[in-house]
Amino acid sequence: LLSNPNDIPGMITHVLPIHDRTCLPPLTREEFMSDTELIARLFPTEGIHACEEVGKVRLPVDMNKIASLHEVTLRMEHVKIRYGSRTILKDLDWEIKNGEKWALFGPNGAGKSTLLSLVYADNPQSYANTLYLFDRKRGSGESIWDIKKRIGYVSPEMHLYYKENVPTLNIVGSGFFDSIGLFRKCNAEQETVALEWMKVFGIEHLKDRLFLTLSSGEQRLALLARAFVKDPDLIILDEPLHGLDVSNKKKAAAIIEQFCDRPGKTLIYVTHYPHE
């Protein structure tokens, strides 16, 4: 099942269109791709979540947040990651200055997730490498929580980490504590901010719905809201639009762009699609 005609793999020869829970007549790949009217009907670009509404939304701002004065958000020097006899990363140098926006491309298995795990303090081999985050060398006394509190993160795998069926508002609020699940209760101010971000992504009506009952697209929007609640200095988005329909892809992309236009916001964006 695909939500974007451009995602159809090259080896596919036939397509079964589905519209309004009804299977339409099957088509060859060529017939389907040439039927612009059908594609427009299956993948509408307008609707209640259309991106033009985003400009009218005021993104929440943490008025108590002190602007970060760091110069370099990330610097890696000759990084090497190895598991057994397999080398994942070798002699990698990478520097991201405060406020820069980076796109990270590469096929599955190229080492993107490993690279991100170093940045997000989830890889123990980071201590065996020369790595700086926010002008501070890893292993110089900071905890992983000191690092995570300045980073917003979402990835396709995050869906798999949530096994407890809790209200969606709890999932969004867990972003304040960098936990999988809500082990600490949000205060009133944090809950208000979480609800504001849910409203930005158009899912405030889902706040009391159990997370595991949501569609995959609704879950993705909730996890995106979770990534933004802290007003992070660094936002890491690993295929953030995966699983969204066309209109919500546009909406989410516009929100990301609007957030990253703020001074001092650094972005690492992982995607398979250059147009994103």
What is each PLM-predicted segment?
Residues L74, I88-D91:
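Conserved structural motif at the start of ABC-family nucleotide-binding domains
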Residues I235-E239:
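Catalytic Walker B motif of ABC-type/P-loop ATPase nucleotide-binding domains
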Residues G173, A188-L206:
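Conserved ABC ATPase "signature" region
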Residues L224-A225:
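Hydrophobic anchor residue at the start of the ABC signature
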Residues T130-D146:
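ABC ATPase NBD Q-loop/coupling interface
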Residues R21-E52:
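Conserved beta-strand-loop-alpha-helix hinge in the C-terminal portion
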